[in-house]
């Protein structure tokens, strides 16, 4: 059962106000809270979805972990397998070498990350090997100096399958005329499409033996790219992968280290958006203060009568706290319902307006993806609801305290 104070507070909330402007202010404050909660849930859901989608795409094209020798203290990559074989959580390992290079064709020059791979093993650690627009890993034949390019890189160079491109390495040849760049022609035998803009526009792959020749490496030099059963557990797994005694000779890093700055930037942006959009709820709470102050002024006679009948100042305070708290509750509830529903369907809503207006709002060259993802996190929803209810409760304190100080004789003097 409701207490007397709660019953009166609810009656005041739903009763028709003599002051129409006060009713309008109350509705605006409730709508403002609902709008703020909705906006906060939708924005955080989109950022969660974006972060999750990008993480998934990166894990399809980037190694979950990498391991190699420091300063080439050992030249045989097979010795690295002793750290990964029969290790729970590691599904596959593939050798690789990697270095920077320039690719030139038809007057165009692009910087690339040149990767030497072992075709039979590379397929085990990446997801895009079966979805190549042209060619396949097995087309890389050692000694033939073949190359597979990202689709964006091939388009920028004007290169197609069967064309030859010139690879320029950072290390030059020393001649009597001075140091000249090392040049080598490679034949394009395939194209890779990962779906990640930066990768598709900078990746070039060749056979690991040809890469060693190109960069003048020992015939067995390579690191290992690892595929894990649970990529989210990569930091914990890599922390124990190398025995303490051998950490001076072997390095290991996981995907969170390689992409740390990017995900830290996204997380920082998420926090800032949370703070900024919380201010919308705070502004609505100030409106709630205004509506309650006006309610206290309108109900002076009622307060005086209740005090005369024996209601304590604390009881009067509770009446208006209940009125304000329920206003905040209704606004929060409406915001949560609208926010969750819109968060689940924001991708469809954006796609509808894109089709209606004939514009494309999400540029894959900037955001890696061409649609708006969303992931409603109920933990975020609960936190937002608690903050909204907390701000609404704080907003009731001043008007309620003012009401509790009403003197019956003064309030009834002019009635």
Swiss-Prot record:
GO biological process, one term: lipoprotein transport
InterPro entries (UniProt xref): ABC3_permease_C, Lipoprotein-release_system, LolCE_TM, MacB_PCD
Keyword Nucleotide-binding listed: no
UniProt keyword annotation of Transcription present: no
Keywords annotated in UniProt: Cell inner membrane, Cell membrane, Membrane, Transmembrane, Transmembrane helix, Transport
Membrane topology per record: Multi-pass membrane protein
Localisation: Cell inner membrane
Main location: membrane
Cellular compartments per GO CC: plasma membrane protein complex
Entry-linked Pfam families: FtsX, MacB_PCD
Transmembrane spans: 24-44, 273-293, 324-344, 378-398
Biological role: Part of an ATP-dependent transport system responsible for the release of lipoproteins targeted to the outer membrane from the inner membrane. Such a release is dependent of the sorting-signal (absence of an Asp at position 2 of the mature lipoprotein) and of LolA.
Homology family: Belongs to the ABC-4 integral membrane protein family. LolC/E subfamily.
Protein name: Lipoprotein-releasing system transmembrane protein LolC
Gene name for this UniProt entry: lolC
């Amino acid at each position: 059962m409701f207490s007397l104070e709660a019953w009166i507070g609810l009656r005041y909330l739903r009763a028709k106000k003599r002051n129409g402007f006060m009713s309008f202010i109350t509705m605006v404050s409730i709508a403002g809270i609902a709008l703020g909660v909705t906006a906060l849930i939708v924005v955080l859901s989109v950022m969660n979805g974006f972060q999750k989608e990008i993480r998934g795409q990166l894990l399809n094209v980037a190694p979950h972990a990498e391991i190699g020798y420091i300063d080439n203290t050992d030249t045989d990559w097979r010795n690295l397998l002793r750290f990964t074989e029969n290790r729970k959580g590691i599904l596959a390992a593939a050798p690789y070498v990697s270095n920077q290079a320039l690719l030139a064709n038809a007057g165009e020059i692009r910087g690339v990350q040149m990767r030497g791979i072992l075709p039979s093993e590379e397929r085990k650690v990446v997801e895009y090997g079966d979805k190549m627009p042209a060619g396949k890993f097995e087309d890389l034949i050692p000694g033939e100096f073949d190359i597979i390019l990202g689709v964006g890189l091939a388009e920028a160079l004007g290169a197609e399958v069967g064309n030859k491109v010139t690879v320029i390495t950072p290390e030059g040849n020393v001649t009597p005329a001075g140091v000249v760049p090392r040049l080598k022609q490679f034949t394009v035998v395939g194209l890779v499409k990962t779906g990640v803009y930066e990768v598709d526009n900078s990746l070039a792959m060749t056979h690991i033996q040809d890469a060693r020749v190109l960069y003048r490496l020992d015939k067995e030099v390579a690191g290992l790219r690892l595929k894990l059963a649970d990529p989210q557990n990569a930091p914990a797994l890599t922390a124990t992968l190398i025995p303490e005694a051998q950490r001076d000779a072997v390095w290991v890093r996981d995907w969170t280290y390689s992409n740390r700055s990017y995900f830290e930037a996204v997380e920082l942006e998420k926090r800032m958006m949370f703070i900024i959009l919380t201010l919308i709820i705070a502004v609505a709470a100030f409106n709630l203060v205004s509506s309650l102050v006006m309610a206290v002024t309108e109900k002076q006679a009622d307060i005086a009568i209740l005090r005369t009948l024996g209601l304590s100042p604390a009881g009067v305070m509770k009446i208006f706290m209940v009125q304000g708290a329920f206003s905040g509750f209704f606004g929060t509830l409406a915001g949560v319902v609208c926010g969750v529903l819109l968060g689940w369907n924001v991708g469809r809503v954006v796609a509808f307006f894109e089709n209606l207006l004939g514009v494309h709002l999400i540029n894959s060259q900037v955001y890696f993806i061409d649609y708006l993802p969303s992931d409603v996190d109920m933990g975020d929803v609960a936190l937002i609801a608690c903050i909204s209810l907390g701000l609404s409760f704080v907003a009731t304190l001043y008007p309620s305290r003012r009401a509790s100080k009403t003197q019956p004789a003064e309030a009834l003097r002019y009635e």
